[in-house]
Amino acid sequence: MLERTLSILKPDVVKRNITGQVNSYIENSGLKIVTQKMCLLTRFQAEEFYAIHKSQHFFIPLVDFMVSGPIIVQVLEGENAISLYRELMGATDPKKANPGTIRGDFAENIDANCVHGSDSLDNAVREIRFFFSDYELLSLK
């Protein structure tokens, strides 16, 4: 099934200037980057986006990291894009991520783990709308 998913290239990817390499992994997997933009999250935006994790011990460090520098948000499209991208990202903890995955090949640690990807169709819709307006998405149809 043709799906869209949200991808975030986190501040560590932008800071280390490896966005092109990560994008190559995405495109070589068969996923299409249909739109992307660079932005700098405010603390409020980061807290809102990750609100589901508010009660977790990693919430504050995650928010701190996500506001530490620019990010790149992307809409990816392809057959079974959500599960394909999650497989391509690799395990959250790069020590457990397989070689050939984004985190396995590029992530420095569990906090600076390079990427975020939607984990379900419902979350993909919500997360894409969080970063992209209807106007921005209209031209993608």
Swiss-Prot record:
EC number(s) reported in the record: 2.7.4.6
Catalytic activity: a 2'-deoxyribonucleoside 5'-diphosphate + ATP = a 2'-deoxyribonucleoside 5'-triphosphate + ADP; a ribonucleoside 5'-diphosphate + ATP = a ribonucleoside 5'-triphosphate + ADP
GO CC aspect terms: cytoplasm
Enzyme class: transferase
Cofactor requirement: Mg(2+)
SUPFAM superfamilies: Nucleoside diphosphate kinase, NDK
Subcellular location: Cytoplasm
GO molecular function list: ATP binding; metal ion binding; nucleoside diphosphate kinase activity
Primary localisation category: cytoplasm
Signal peptide: none
Protein family (similarity comment): Belongs to the NDK family.
Entry function: Major role in the synthesis of nucleoside triphosphates other than ATP. The ATP gamma phosphate is transferred to the NDP beta phosphate via a ping-pong mechanism, using a phosphorylated active-site intermediate.
The name this protein goes by in its record: Nucleoside diphosphate kinase
Protein species of origin: Ehrlichia canis (strain Jake)
Gene name per UniProt: ndk
